[in-house]
């Protein structure tokens, strides 16, 4: 068995990248996974790449791509008597005026939970209160939400709803290829691909002639993905490959896919930093819409207020890096986040802040 942390193997991979890079002009690769950015920053992978190879972070953080309007909706519901249950990262994301953490300090009932199941247990125990779970995440977390709603479908629980913020990754990849910054290739997300398998990438790869490699999260995984992309570019190919074979099956997690297809359907939704992304969201199917808070409340239109100087939108689209932001590390820090990219552990700005100071 290969030791994925073997330093000699890593050095060999870096040497291989440098040798292959001599055969091309320029190559711009995007990844769409916060865990990949952790690996790239922690181990200084960008520093060892030749100048003609660029790897940029994309919209790989579910907290970061949740829109300000969705945060404001949760705050509106908290102001109107709902118990808001949320994962820890969402608790601190700024809305147009305040965050859920600030609303809690003002007396609103906002609770941090570790899962949707914990929120459901609270709702069952406190029947006199109305609960909303802020459901975020990509294909990796949508099955958990779906499974919980399936189990609740025929049960007498009428005080539990979700604020559905789930999103799909391949559609935003297509948006970036079609309308975003110029990209040559993608390092596809490892966690998402354990659920989806390789199928969602085939159409994109064929349509846009962009190499796509699913990668794991060790330094050697990322380096090998770059090598695989380079080999495709040099040979004039564009195909989907799986570097992360120890975790990702070509067919993905079929059971999780069945749960997603049972509960959700594809819908067009905006992402933070993006306009409406075609099929970019998971909408609840008709038979599960009783859990959709939008079916029970008429949410007023709240105008977004982007903080002056914040470039989270450009960072999420791969147009800029955190170090290009005038607020980074001064006005905007993990203790005082101005934009969503500084809040979550998966956020690009948070990751840059953590590892650029080692």
From Swiss-Prot:
<dbReference type="GO" id="GO:0005506">
    <property type="term" value="F:iron ion binding"/>
</dbReference>
<dbReference type="GO" id="GO:0070025">
    <property type="term" value="F:carbon monoxide binding"/>
</dbReference>
<dbReference type="InterPro" id="IPR002780">
    <property type="entry name" value="Hyd_form_HypD"/>
</dbReference>
<comment type="similarity">
    <text>Belongs to the HypD family.</text>
</comment>
<dbReference type="InterPro" id="IPR042244">
    <property type="entry name" value="HypD_2_sf"/>
</dbReference>
<protein>
    <recommendedName>
        <fullName>Putative hydrogenase expression/formation protein MJ0993</fullName>
    </recommendedName>
</protein>
<feature type="binding site">
    <location>
        <position position="33"/>
    </location>
    <ligand>
        <name>Fe cation</name>
    </ligand>
</feature>
<feature type="binding site">
    <location>
        <position position="61"/>
    </location>
    <ligand>
        <name>Fe cation</name>
    </ligand>
</feature>
<dbReference type="Pfam" id="PF01924">
    <property type="entry name" value="HypD"/>
</dbReference>
<dbReference type="GO" id="GO:0051604">
    <property type="term" value="P:protein maturation"/>
</dbReference>
<keyword id="KW-0479">Metal-binding</keyword>
<dbReference type="InterPro" id="IPR042243">
    <property type="entry name" value="HypD_1"/>
</dbReference>
<dbReference type="GO" id="GO:0051539">
    <property type="term" value="F:4 iron, 4 sulfur cluster binding"/>
</dbReference>
<keyword id="KW-0408">Iron</keyword>
<feature type="binding site">
    <location>
        <position position="64"/>
    </location>
    <ligand>
        <name>Fe cation</name>
    </ligand>
</feature>
């Amino acid at each position: 068995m290969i030791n994925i942390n073997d330093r000699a193997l890593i050095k060999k991979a870096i040497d291989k990248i440098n040798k292959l890079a001599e055969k091309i002009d320029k190559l711009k690769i995007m990844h769409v996974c916060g865990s990949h950015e952790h690996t790239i920053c922690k181990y200084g992978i960008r520093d060892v790449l030749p100048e003609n190879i660029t790897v940029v972070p994309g919209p790989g953080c579910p907290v970061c791509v949740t829109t300000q309007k969705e945060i404001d909706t949760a705050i509106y519901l908290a102001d109107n008597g709902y118990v808001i249950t949320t994962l820890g990262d969402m608790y601190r994301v700024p809305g147009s005026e305040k965050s859920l953490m600030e609303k809690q300090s003002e007396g609103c009932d906002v609770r941090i939970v570790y899962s949707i199941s914990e929120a459901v247990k609270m709702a069952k125990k406190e029947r006199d209160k109305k609960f909303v779970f802020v459901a975020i995440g990509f294909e990796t977390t949508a099955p958990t939400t779906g499974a919980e709603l399936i189990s609740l479908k025929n049960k007498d629980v009428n005080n539990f709803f979700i604020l559905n913020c789930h999103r799909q990754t391949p559609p935003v990849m297509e948006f970036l290829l079609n309308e975003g910054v110029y990209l040559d290739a993608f390092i596809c997300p490892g966690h998402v691909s354990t659920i989806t398998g390789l199928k969602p990438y085939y159409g994109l790869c064929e349509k846009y002639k962009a190499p796509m490699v699913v990668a794991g999260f060790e330094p050697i995984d990322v380096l090998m993905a770059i090598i695989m992309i380079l080999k495709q570019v040099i040979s004039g190919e564009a195909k989907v490959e799986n570097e992360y074979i120890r975790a990702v099956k070509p067919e993905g997690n079929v059971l999780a896919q069945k749960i997603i297809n049972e509960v959700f359907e594809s819908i067009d939704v905006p992402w933070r930093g993006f306009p409406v992304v075609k099929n970019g969201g998971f909408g609840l199917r008709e038979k599960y819409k009783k859990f959709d808070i939008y079916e029970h409340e008429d949410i007023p239109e709240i105008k977004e207020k982007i903080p002056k100087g914040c470039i989270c939108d450009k960072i999420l689209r791969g147009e800029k890096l955190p170090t290009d932001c005038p607020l980074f590390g001064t006005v905007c820090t993990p203790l005082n986040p101005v934009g969503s990219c500084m809040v979550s552990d998966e956020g690009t700005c948070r990751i840059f802040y953590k590892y650029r100071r080692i």
